[in-house]
Amino acid sequence: MPEFLTVVSWPFLILLSFQIGVAAGAPQPWHCAPCTAERLGLCPPVPASCPEISRPAGCGCCPTCALPMGAACGVATARCAQGLSCRALPGEPRPLHALTRGQGACVPEPAAPATSTLFSSQHEEAKAAVVSADELSESPEMTEEQLLDSFHLMAPSREDQPILWNAISTYSSMRAREIADLKKWKEPCQRELYKVLERLAAAQQKAGDEIYKFYLPNCNKNGFYHSKQCETSLDGEAGLCWCVYPWSGKKIPGSLETRGDPNCHQYFNVHN
């Protein structure tokens, strides 16, 4: 496994992409890998019966059939049809957790004033969706899971939100506020998370570098590792997943790397 240019945690980076609306200034954003003629040539045809063809979600290249009103949707599914956006169901206690598992629904986009610009609407949604910088500074033990649970808005289908848009800016802002002081983060996954972000911040300063794969540790609310760790790439290829020990983050011997679900529970049934 490459040292850090391997994986990105979908929920955490989606959160970071919106946090920047309330954080400090941003460096140059990273973009998805370009769709080459070769990759486009491998795309399956969209059914002729499809009423609306939409752009692929994430960093994919193949057009898809837009999801209709009421259809199940999520971070990695096809986009909702025009005029709809993917939202967690009312009363859902963990909205983003549900969206990352395709348990949202395509619903009408909320009406916006005619004078509202794309930037201002994103900014207002960001402020409403995430914990403010002041709240973060007063809660140095705030975890990834707590942050994710505070996030409940997804970009409307007409908007194209880069996965890693200004993610490092949020880290830089947190560093400035001493939120990410490694001495304050005692648990292993939390410490590795911010070390990786620091390396990514340094890598982004190198002009001309095009980085399409990243790794961010997937931490639980206690600062340890989720047993399932996955990669997400910006080149449209499905990422690998693997299993680790929650207390150390080290890969479980004999466990496989797969582009699907590695079923990590099976290894704990054996080892416990």
From Swiss-Prot:
The modification Phosphotyrosine is found at Y171. One of its GO terms (biological process) is insulin receptor signaling pathway. GO terms for cellular component: extracellular space; Golgi apparatus. Disulfide bonds join C32-C59, C35-C61, C43-C62, C50-C65, C73-C86, C80-C106, C189-C219, C230-C241, C243-C264. Residues 1-25 form the signal peptide. The keyword ATP-binding does not apply. Residues 186-264 form the Thyroglobulin type-1 domain. PROSITE patterns: IGFBP_N_1, IGFBP_N_2, THYROGLOBULIN_1_1, THYROGLOBULIN_1_2. Residues 28-109 form the IGFBP N-terminal domain. This is Insulin-like growth factor-binding protein 1. It comes from Mus musculus. The gene is Igfbp1.
